[in-house]
Every structure is written in C-alpha cells, then in structure tokens.
C-alpha cells in the first residue's frame, strides 16, 4: 500500500462509500495499471466504471461530486481546505519522506531508490545528504499543525474532518517509520491523530486487476466533457499529459475535456476498451502529441 493512498481511504470512509481495492506493485513497471491509465503509474488511481482518475487532487474532486455529503471541505474553511491539502501532500510530504526514510535508508531496497530516482529525481546520493534539512523542515511544519490545533478544535476546519486533515495525517503517520510518534507533538496532535484513525478505511473489498479491467470494458465513460475556449487546445486533438516531475511517463490520447481544473483524455486498449482518463490541471504538463 502506498502511503499516499491512505488519504483516499480516509475520504472513502468519511463519505461511507463502499469500494474495491486492487493492489499494484510499489516499483515500476505496473502493466495492469497502465492498461487503464495509458502509462500513468503513480498511486493512487481511482476507477469509476470506465472513468479513470489519476492523482489525489482529481480523485477527491470526483468523490466530492459523486457523494457531496459529508463534504471533504467543511465550513468555515471550505475550498481553502484543498489548498492546505495540496501543501501537505507536496511540500511537507517530501520533508516527511526525508524524516521517515533518511534515519534508516536501508529500510527500503536498492530497487526502490533506482525507481524513485528515475521517476521523481529522488536519488539516494543526493537525497541522504539533504536529510538533516528535511528533518528540520518536517518538524517546522509539524509545529504549524500543533499551533493550528492548540485552540482545542478537533479538526483543522473546526468540528468536522476533511481532505486537509487526511493529507496532514499522512505525514504524521509516515514518520512513524522512524519512530517519531504522534505524542511527540503534544496531546492536541496525538488526540487529533487518534480521532482520524478511528475513521478507518470504510467498506473495502479486495479485487483483482483483471476484474477492474473487465469492469471498465463492460461499461462506458460518462462523458459530457468539453474543452474550454482560450486554453490553446481543441476537442479531438491528440495530446500528451505528464507530471511536472522528472518522471518521463506520458499518457497520450484524444482530448475531450479541458478547463482550469481538469484534463480528460479518451483512449482505447484492447483489454479495457474505451476509457476516459482524468487528470487535475495543476501539476500536469499538457502538450500536443
């Protein structure tokens, strides 16, 4: 299980959505996953029929649209909670990785370092010397969390948990690999950690990759997308999407949806038939293919 997919598990449990889990390899290649995504190999990926959602940001948006209540963005923060979640899942997450893995780099095999170096630029020889800085940055960010909870609020937004809490929690859990336990940050953080942990991961059923692929083939994408004017692309154009990271993987398909929030590509594979692959606009490089 990827540490990042815990965010989505918590979202599903919070919304009381029954879901199916397909295990994917930690290290590339991931051939069955690529059948559905077209080459995107990061975790998590969510499938609803023949619609495939790549990246936590677009998955949470899809879950919020599918089951609006209880919201992942409770008042009074509302959508500002997404900005906190994006910070927690990107800037703070990398420092959490330093705090978690740097203290004991042998906890993961050499194949892991090779894979992460190729895909994310996370090379052992440059990562490990930066560990002291990342550890300091992790604790600095943890202090922000501690300060936010110091007024007695049960969750970041107040009385209800949401995406921001789940993304922040992943970092506190990640560093437990290095023996950094929640109580180190004080009672407010430890209690917050325990409240979120009690949410669990919902109604989960294990599924095979073949079952997921067959399910996509037996359904059709929902559709109804459009390409907004003034974005530099046209509906029906062949395009490629890749992340802003060093990861060379690209997904190529027919552009069917584009706005300031999302990118949607239509593509086909003999095993899954036609699927629509969804990406967030943030963090993705869109180019003509």
Model feature map: region roles:
Residues 4-115, 233, 243, 252, ...:
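GST-like domain detector, emphasizing the conserved glutathione-binding G-site
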Residues 88-198:
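GST-like fold's C-terminal all-alpha helical module
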Residues 161-163, 233-236:
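Short gly/pro-enriched beta-turn/loop segments at secondary-structure junctions
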Residues 171, 209, 244:
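Histidine- and/or cysteine-centered catalytic micro-motif in compact active-site loops
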Residues 201-235:
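Mixed-charge, Lys/Arg-rich low-complexity intrinsically disordered regions
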Residues 238-244:
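A short beta-strand micro-motif
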Residues 247:
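Phosphate-binding active sites in nucleotide-utilizing proteins
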